[in-house]
Amino acid sequence: MSGGKPRGLNAARKLRNNRREQRWSDLHYKKRALGTAFKSSPFGGSSHAKGIVLEKVGVEAKQPNSAIRKCVRVQLIKNGKKVTAFVPNDGCLNFVDENDEVLLAGFGRKGKAKGDIPGVRFKVVKVSGVGLLALWKEKKEKPRS
């Protein structure tokens, strides 16, 4: 009955090699070791990114909810990739116009979508250099250009 791991005095190499091979099954290790966060994610490993608004879109919520979530299509300045970003709060889509410069941040769980919004991994934080929350609370006004 041979089961389990080797336990002898001279088993260190076997244990080390085994552990090294098994680590590749761990998704977090694999992503870190291969550097895929920098290669594949639109933000390139950073927490925020600036972009230009291309259009406003409504994304339908997943079942069992029924709503149209207000989002914008944004082209990132740093690499030209196009992403969809959620615009939080009631009526905040009115502050965002096409060709505005927006600051995006992550939204949801470790690069996955949040809640009932399919495929939307980012949210709008600032519009034309002014915080979206400040605009919404009417503490600041959007600069007229």
Swiss-Prot record:
Record carries keyword Cell wall biogenesis/degradation: no
GO biological process: translation
Tree of life domain: Eukaryota
CDD domains: Ribosomal_S23
One Gene Ontology CC term in the entry: ribosome
PTM-bearing positions, type Hydroxyproline: P64
Location of region: Disordered: 1-23
InterPro entries hit by this protein: NA-bd_OB-fold, Ribosomal_uS12, Ribosomal_uS12_euk/arc
Matches recorded under PANTHER family: 30S RIBOSOMAL PROTEIN S12 FAMILY MEMBER
Assembly information from the UniProt record: Component of the small ribosomal subunit (SSU). Mature N.crassa ribosomes consist of a small (40S) and a large (60S) subunit. The 40S small subunit contains 1 molecule of ribosomal RNA (18S rRNA) and at least 32 different proteins. The large 60S subunit contains 3 rRNA molecules (26S, 5.8S and 5S rRNA) and at least 42 different proteins.
Protein function: Component of the ribosome, a large ribonucleoprotein complex responsible for the synthesis of proteins in the cell. The small ribosomal subunit (SSU) binds messenger RNAs (mRNAs) and translates the encoded message by selecting cognate aminoacyl-transfer RNA (tRNA) molecules. The large subunit (LSU) contains the ribosomal catalytic site termed the peptidyl transferase center (PTC), which catalyzes the formation of peptide bonds, thereby polymerizing the amino acids delivered by tRNAs into a polypeptide chain.
Protein name: Small ribosomal subunit protein uS12
Protein source organism: Neurospora crassa (strain ATCC 24698 / 74-OR23-1A / CBS 708.71 / DSM 1257 / FGSC 987)
Lineage of source species: Eukaryota, Fungi, Dikarya, Ascomycota, Pezizomycotina
